[in-house]
């Protein structure tokens, strides 16, 4: 089984928590679905470097990923950029979004880094809509009828990742 490192830069505690949760949940999902890659928070190569980028609006529900792959589509290195601050508009005004929302965004970008380029459905949808919880801990992102977390990959995404990492 291949291992890919995830190096968290100076991204603040909110993103650090979300990225750690994304790594853990993706590893569980990959294992359950037979995708033979594991994300590790230390010591592995190839490496996904994660940092925040003030150019990405906190109102957006996305990050930016650039990745270099070999001829077979396997990762050599990647750079994931996330918004510095993630916000949600509520009836009481704008507030910081919960860790669950940040986890979904981080996981989406990590899967892009692993070679999944297209946007389709579930975690890899092009459009993710904010779902405000009663409090920040309940915030989710929705792709069609699928609300996350927990993270979910479509059958197409699973097959694509299996093809890259088999």
Give names to the regions the model predicted.
Residues 6, 10-13, 35, 44, ...:
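Intrinsically disordered, low-complexity regions
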Residues 2, 46-48, 156:
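Residue-level marker of intrinsically disordered, low-complexity segments enriched
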Residues 16-113, 117-120:
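Metzincin-family zinc-dependent endopeptidase catalytic domain
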Residues 76-93, 100-101, 117-166:
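Metalloprotease/metallohydrolase-associated module, dominated by Zn2+-dependent proteases
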Residues 1-21:
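Fold-level signature of zinc-dependent metallopeptidase catalytic domains
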């Amino acid at each position: 089984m291949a291992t890919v490192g995830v190096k968290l830069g100076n991204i603040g505690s909110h993103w650090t928590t979300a990225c750690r949760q994304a790594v853990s949940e993706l590893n569980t999902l990959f294992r359950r679905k037979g995708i033979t890659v594991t994300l590790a928070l230390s010591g592995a190569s190839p490496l996904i470097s994660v940092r925040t980028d003030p150019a990405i609006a906190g109102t957006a529900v996305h990050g930016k990923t650039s990745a270099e792959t070999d001829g077979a589509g396997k990762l050599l290195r990647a750079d994931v950029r996330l918004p510095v601050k993630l916000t949600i508009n509520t009836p009481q005004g704008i507030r910081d979004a919960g860790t669950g929302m940040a986890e979904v965004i981080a996981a989406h970008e990590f899967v892009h880094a692993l070679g999944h380029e297209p946007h389709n459905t579930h975690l890899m949808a092009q459009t993710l809509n904010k779902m405000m919880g009663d409090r920040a801990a309940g915030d989710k992102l929705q792709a069609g009828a699928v609300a996350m977390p927990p993270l979910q990959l479509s059958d197409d995404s699973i097959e694509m990742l299996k093809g890259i990492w088999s």
